[in-house]
């Protein structure tokens, strides 16, 4: 059975994410910073796994991020700034980073660096 390269990459990412989720869980004091990436956008949520609730969220679909000039990394940096601001407003200083099975580089690394620069600790 021959699969496309994109199908193989997707399955590999889901396997990596499943392995990661065995080890990573968020609490109310230290929620999980979940990253979801598509070809055009990036979405980030702070999730409390104990109650199953989303504490804060940010996305590149939001109006102030959509209007930015530049490539997708610039938007990822802005999304990182937004989620850090919203986390601080919710009284959160420390998070657990869940990269969602994506390799740590490019937009994911830019987002993580931006979150750290804006005051959240991993």
UniProtKB/Swiss-Prot annotation:
InterPro entries reported for this sequence: Ribosomal_uL18_bac-type (IPR004389), Ribosomal_uL18_bac/euk (IPR005484)
Keyword Protease annotated: no
Gene Ontology CC: one annotated term: cytosolic large ribosomal subunit
Molecular function, one GO term: 5S rRNA binding
Pfam families, sorted: Ribosomal_L18p (PF00861)
UniProt keywords, alphabetically: Ribonucleoprotein, Ribosomal protein, RNA-binding, rRNA-binding
Protein function: This is one of the proteins that bind and probably mediate the attachment of the 5S RNA into the large ribosomal subunit, where it forms part of the central protuberance.
Protein family (similarity comment): Belongs to the universal ribosomal protein uL18 family.
Quaternary organization: Part of the 50S ribosomal subunit; part of the 5S rRNA/L5/L18/L25 subcomplex. Contacts the 5S and 23S rRNAs.
NCBIfam families associated with the record: L18_bact (TIGR00060)
Protein name: Large ribosomal subunit protein uL18
Organism whose genome encodes this protein: Mycobacterium leprae (strain TN)
Classification lineage: Bacteria, Bacillati, Actinomycetota, Actinomycetes, Mycobacteriales
């Amino acid at each position: 059975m021959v699969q496309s390269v994109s199908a193989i990459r997707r399955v590999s990412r889901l396997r990596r994410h499943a392995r990661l989720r065995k080890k990573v869980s968020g609490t109310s004091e230290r929620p999980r910073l979940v990253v979801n990436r598509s070809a055009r956008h990036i979405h980030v949520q702070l999730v409390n796994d104990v109650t199953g609730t989303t504490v804060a969220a940010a996305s590149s679909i939001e109006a102030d991020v959509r209007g930015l000039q530049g490539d997708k990394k610039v938007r990822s940096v802005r999304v990182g700034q937004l989620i850090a601001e919203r986390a601080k407003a919710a009284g959160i200083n420390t998070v657990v980073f869940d990269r969602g099975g994506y390799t740590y580089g490019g937009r994911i690394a830019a987002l993580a660096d931006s979150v750290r620069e804006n005051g959240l600790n991993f």
